[in-house]
């Protein structure tokens, strides 16, 4: 093998490394041109999204780390080749020196072939020494480049880790504020529902209930008035029937005693006639007793209707100070109310949720930064 083969191998390795580096640079330049020219709309939206979120720098660092890892692998391969070349140069020079020493030991018995061999070894010793020195220098350069590549790779990895930490903190902060915002919206909706929607719904239910009660009372009063009218008509029919029945015997008896008609006309009415007229004018006691409870029952119904409507009418729903004062007095008064277990549990859970939300908002606002 020629003496110049070892440094040529090392230099070819270095040239190959430089060529691969230039190839990577051309590849990245072409990739950037392609990304800038094609797919502008869709890729522009993704780039804007990643740029806003701070993830584009992380992607760039990731690509740099991949390229740096490839460079580290190449430098390690070159270091291995330089070590092999340096070992080969050392072995070749050592073998040449051993052969020279052997020839010098039998110098008195040299043949023409030994003389030519000694001459060639002596001439190549300088070249072998130069090749060994070049291989050593190439090994040092390769090791230094490998160390630089490894250090740059570590730096890139640390930079990527730092950027990812910053990005994750930013996303976590945004998610935290988003969570607090949603919680605040929920609390606001809860307060709006409790302050505005719930009273409106309650008033609507009370109004509907009052309308139904009033309709039922009016229907009942109408039925009672109809019954009273029927009973009054019955009483009037009974009152007209009694005089007709009393007058019928007199009409029948009148033709039998015609001679006494004048006498009866002239004779004043006696006690019997007064009793008869009294019986005709006075209605039946049973009918009077039947109508009296009906008439007395109508008056309590009217009174109960007025009292019920007075109780069911809602308080003034205006925004006047008197209305608010009355509402606060009702909230903190001694009035007894009846609640079901479900309503009590619902009120307790709503109060606990509202307290937790308020405490969370206060902690988020006043906690030390």
From Swiss-Prot:
Record-stated family: Belongs to the SHE9 family.
Coiled-coil intervals, chain numbering: 128-156
Function: Required for the maintenance of the structure of the mitochondrial inner membrane. Involved in mitochondrial morphology. Causes growth arrest when highly overexpressed.
Keywords (A to Z) from UniProt: Coiled coil, Membrane, Mitochondrion, Mitochondrion inner membrane, Transit peptide, Transmembrane, Transmembrane helix
Location of this chain's protein in the cell: Mitochondrion inner membrane
Lineage of origin: Eukaryota, Fungi, Dikarya, Ascomycota, Pezizomycotina
GO cellular component: mitochondrial inner membrane
Transmembrane segments: 177-197, 346-366
Subunit and interaction comment: Homooligomer.
Membrane topology recorded in Swiss-Prot or TrEMBL: Multi-pass membrane protein
Name the UniProt record assigns to this protein: Sensitive to high expression protein 9 homolog, mitochondrial
Mitochondrial intermembrane side: 198-345
Annotated Pfam families: She9_MDM33
Mitochondrial matrix face residues: 367-369
Biological process per Gene Ontology, one example term: inner mitochondrial membrane organization
Keyword Repressor: no
Main location: mitochondrion
Keyword Mitochondrion appears in the UniProt entry: yes
């Amino acid at each position: 093998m020629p003496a110049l083969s070892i440094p040529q191998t090392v230099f070819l390795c270095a040239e190959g490394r430089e060529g691969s580096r230039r190839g990577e640079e051309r590849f990245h330049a072409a990739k950037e041109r392609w990304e800038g020219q094609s797919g502008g709309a869709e890729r522009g939206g993704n780039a804007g999204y990643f740029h806003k979120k701070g993830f584009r720098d992380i992607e760039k660092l990731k690509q740099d780390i991949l390229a740096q890892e490839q460079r580290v692998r190449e430098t390690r391969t070159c270091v291995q080749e330089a070590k092999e070349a340096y070992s080969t140069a050392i072995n070749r020079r050592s073998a040449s020196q051993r052969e020279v020493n052997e020839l010098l030991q039998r110098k008195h018995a040299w043949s023409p072939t030994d003389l030519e061999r000694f001459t060639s070894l002596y001439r190549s010793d300088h070249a072998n020494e130069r090749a060994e020195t070049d291989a050593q220098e190439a090994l040092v350069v390769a090791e230094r480049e490998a160390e630089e590549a490894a250090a740059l790779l570590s730096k890139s990895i640390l930079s990527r880790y730092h950027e990812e930490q910053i990005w994750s903190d930013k996303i976590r902060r945004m998610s935290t504020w988003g969570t607090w915002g949603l919680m605040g919206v929920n609390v606001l909706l809860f307060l709006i529902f409790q302050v505005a929607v719930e009273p409106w719904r309650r008033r609507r239910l009370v109004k509907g209930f009052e309308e139904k009660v009033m309709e039922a009372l009016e229907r009942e009063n109408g039925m009672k008035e109809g019954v009273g009218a029927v009973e009054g008509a019955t009483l009037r029919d009974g009152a007209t029937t009694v005089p007709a029945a009393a007058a019928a015997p007199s009409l029948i008896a009148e033709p039998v005693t015609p001679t006494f008609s004048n006498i009866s006309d002239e004779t004043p009415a006696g006690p019997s006639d007064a009793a008869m007229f009294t019986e005709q004018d006075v209605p039946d006691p049973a009918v009077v007793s039947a109508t009296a409870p009906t008439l007395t029952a109508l008056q309590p119904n009217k009174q109960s209707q007025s009292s019920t409507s007075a109780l069911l009418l809602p308080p003034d729903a205006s925004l006047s100070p008197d209305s608010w004062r009355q509402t606060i007095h009702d909230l903190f008064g001694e009035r007894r109310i009846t609640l079901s277990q479900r309503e009590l549990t619902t009120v307790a859970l709503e109060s606990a949720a509202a307290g937790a939300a308020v405490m969370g908002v206060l902690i988020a606002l006043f906690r030390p930064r």
